[in-house]
Curated annotation (Swiss-Prot):
Self-association state and partner proteins as the record states: Part of the 50S ribosomal subunit. Binds 23S rRNA.
Encoding gene per record: rpl18a
Disulfide partners: none
Lineage: Archaea, Thermoproteota, Thermoprotei, Desulfurococcales, Desulfurococcaceae
The name this protein goes by in its record: Large ribosomal subunit protein eL20
Keywords: Ribonucleoprotein, Ribosomal protein, RNA-binding, rRNA-binding
Length: 87
């Protein structure tokens, strides 16, 4: 079984592409098995939350980070869990 890694994905997304287009920067920290899954997750989340198509999302940088570099408390809490079910 592969180990889950933490990735920081940075890029820009095009908001209000039809009226007044604005490129907005974003940074997402995600847990994934590899870079491809992390990119797919970012496309999925930004597309569903902001009603964006993939062509309106441009990923500029993706890097694997350690637990001490994570800024999102939810990611840290998930990474520190030993198991999900009580015994």
């Amino acid at each position: 079984m592969s180990e889950i890694k933490i990735y920081r994905v940075e890029g820009v997304m095009l908001l209000s592409h039809d009226r007044f287009p604005v490129w907005q920067k974003f940074t997402k920290e995600v847990r994934a098995l590899n870079k491809e899954q992390a990119i797919e997750y970012v496309y999925s989340v930004l597309g569903s939350n902001h009603k964006l198509r993939r062509k309106h999302i441009r990923i500029t940088k993706i890097e694997e980070i350690t637990l001490s570099e994570v800024r999102d408390r939810r990611i840290v809490a998930l990474a520190r869990l030993e198991r999900f079910v009580k015994l």
